Amino acid sequence: MFYPDPFDVIIIGGGHAGTEAAMAAARMGQQTLLLTHNIDTLGQMSCNPAIGGIGKGHLVKEVDALGGLMAKAIDQAGIQFRILNASKGPAVRATRAQADRVLYRQAVRTALENQPNLMIFQQAVEDLIVENDRVVGAVTQMGLKFRAKAVVLTVGTFLDGKIHIGLDNYSSGRAGDPPSIPLSRRLRELPLRVSRLKTGTPPRIDARTIDFSVLAQQHGDNPMPVFSFMGNASQHPQQVPCYITHTNEKTHDVIRNNLDRSPMYAGVIEGIGPRYCPSIEDKVMRFADRNQHQIFLEPEGLTSNEIYPNGISTSLPFDVQMQIVRSMQGMENAKIVRPGYAIEYDFFDPRDLKPTLESKFIQGLFFAGQINGTTGYEEAAAQGLLAGLNAARLSADKEGWAPARSQAYLGVLVDDLCTLGTKEPYRMFTSRAEYRLMLREDNADLRLTEMGRELGLVDDERWARFNEKLENIERERQRLKSTWVTPSAESAGEVNAHLTAPLSREASGEDLLRRPEMTYAQLTSLTPFAPGLDDAQAAEQVEIQVKYEGYIARQQDEIEKQLRNENTLLPATLDYRQVSGLSNEVIAKLNDHKPVSIGQASRISGVTPAAISILLVWLKKQGMLRRSA
């Protein structure tokens, strides 16, 4: 039977991609349905209990700047907050928070259940309704059919998921959850390129069986960082430390002696695992010269005795896992409460997607999260938000939107996936962005919130706070530009005490702030320039904008040069065999990828700058040279 009410957008899956997609579509006023096999696992952290990190924290801030959920949820659930790379430049500083799994899940579910225009329904999906190469709905396991103008697939590791522990394996979506086999088979019938990937997770340890007294503690930062631009540290629950132990030669011997029982090394697992989150087996074999690896013992929550040993992801048999765990300092009597495992699952070639994350072959069908070949909650959340907002726009007969590489890490992520594809689980790093000085955590709202407002993602409260911050930045910069001190002034001595070289001529507040030895806090403690801003976010922007003004201006020039041809559109129906002068290799690659713009075409391996020039000349001659807004 058909459900009586049609929807604008259906989201399939309630993980980090699905929850952001559902919230985005509903915030934009579209009638949205979130289908999940279990309402109790909405926002579940399937692997590590943490949000953020290098590159990943940047994505979380961008999701937040667009009105998303993840940063708000972790502010309510984070039990240890740190700024990574705090001693380095602002471009690579990143926020990371240890999470209480239960509090995080509760925060996500509460937000979903209180979001207007959003209905949540518990049923696994087994089929899609596709008519004339357009998706028009979904069918659940009990045969209930839902109609919609757009469908977003965010099914994580559930498609034909298979768990491996040693040489034993069984079908599962993740530990404790069933796989989605009928939907996997249905999707394989569609004109989509499907492959397999794998990821893994470590065994969980009973904290009561660990001797923490012999281990080094790692505390969070004080003052505590905050993730959301709308958040504050008073929202954070109780803060707790993590602990550090190490593997040793005994650990490594155990692993080497049991490699024949590893499903990866025995050839049982075909899928490729994440390069930047390798199993302990991989680490021992790939870095054979190292006699130890650092392991972080991370609490899973304030009311849980489970510890997540970050760094020993493994699919070795359980008896070997016990030996590995007990070989490490402080863990000699440790008990495992959940075994580690590897999971293999279907993923779809993201080169078959438009930058909006809509399928090139099935109209109205969007893909987000691990099924696009990514790894990590943050990468999934960012894709979910983008897919959800574009599904909402499609259902409202509006054009799609995707950020440029120069605009957001989300733009880098999507462009990398849709242009280059991936053969291994993709994770975000700051090094992937060529314009990272412009794409900082601290300015994510300045880059994206205005666009979020135009798209209908940003509510009145966030918009008012954003504009207040902009006004504070502008007013303070004007104040510092127009406030001067001279070498003969009464306050010159006070100023000189903070300088490596004394004043030799008149200087404004901005002149002084540009000096590497002068911070904004120091400057505004001096009589001529006091008081400083109470708005900490605006104060941070003033300092960064002034100190890095020259570098930022130079990078902005680079972006503008690059954008001259970046946004030149390529017709979807263009047969590149018509373009004389292109090599057969370039023609084949362009016809295979069907890039949407010159910028995307230029990043395809083998497409040379000369080929791009030929293409631009041809487009001009044909009168087809046009740029996107």
From Swiss-Prot:
An MF annotation (GO) of this entry: flavin adenine dinucleotide binding
Keywords for the protein's UniProt record, in alphabetical order: Cytoplasm, FAD, Flavoprotein, NAD, tRNA processing
Pfam families cross-referenced by the UniProt entry: GIDA, GIDA_C_1st, SAM_GIDA_C
Protein localization: Cytoplasm
Record's keyword annotation contains tRNA processing: yes
GO BP annotation list: tRNA methylation; tRNA wobble uridine modification
Top-level taxon in the UniProt lineage: Bacteria
GO cellular component: cytosol
Co-factor requirement: FAD
Residues binding FAD, per UniProt: 13-18, 125, 180, 370
Binding, NAD(+): 273-287
Similarity field: Belongs to the MnmG family.
Description of how the protein assembles with itself and partners: Homodimer. Heterotetramer of two MnmE and two MnmG subunits.
Job description of the protein: NAD-binding protein involved in the addition of a carboxymethylaminomethyl (cmnm) group at the wobble position (U34) of certain tRNAs, forming tRNA-cmnm(5)s(2)U34.
Protein name: tRNA uridine 5-carboxymethylaminomethyl modification enzyme MnmG
